[in-house]
């Protein structure tokens, strides 16, 4: 029975990896422009940065990125350069009263030079996992933390929010942040 359970778990993990690879082959993010505002919805994947750059090239007057429903990122190797590009462009990030952002969507929100949200918006965070270990299971000075830790530090001025997220909920769950937590970690500039 133990072998069957282990085999099933490995197969399921393999299926998850295949699903992620498949989702990285199609556009999972949509962008809509209204004046100087760019509305974004969907999962961030390997196609998102290229989509974003195309929209910006056609609409150089964009000043604000509004995240609507952004459940996360399938590809941190895309999300982090996308976020640095948002910061480089000096964009404001904004959440409407119906915005729901989680995981990598929250990381992208941090890129705004100004970060604002309306009452009712939802911000959800959790740990990352490399498939075998959760972030909190690595020593604090482990190299595995560095890319995400440094990114948060670059965006917020310190890495306290990074450490909060990896303990807030395991990778397969989500913690919806309270207004006090949002304020404590400086997610909003206004």
Where are these predicted regions, by residue range?
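C-terminal motif of bacterial Sec signal peptides marking the signal peptidase cleavage site
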Residues: 12-14
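A short, well-ordered alpha-helical element
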Residues: 21, 41-63
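Bacterial signal peptide processing site
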Residues: 16-19
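Glycine-rich beta-to-alpha active-site loop
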Residues: 87-129
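Bacterial N-terminal signal peptides that target proteins for export
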Residues: 1-4
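Extracytoplasmic/secreted envelope proteins and their assembly/folding machinery
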Residues: 49-56, 79-83, 87, 106, ...
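Short, glycine-/small-residue-enriched flexible loop/hinge segments at domain edges that mediate gating
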Residues: 61-78, 92-100
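Charged, glycine-interspersed solvent-exposed loop segments at helix/strand-loop junctions
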Residues: 64, 132-190
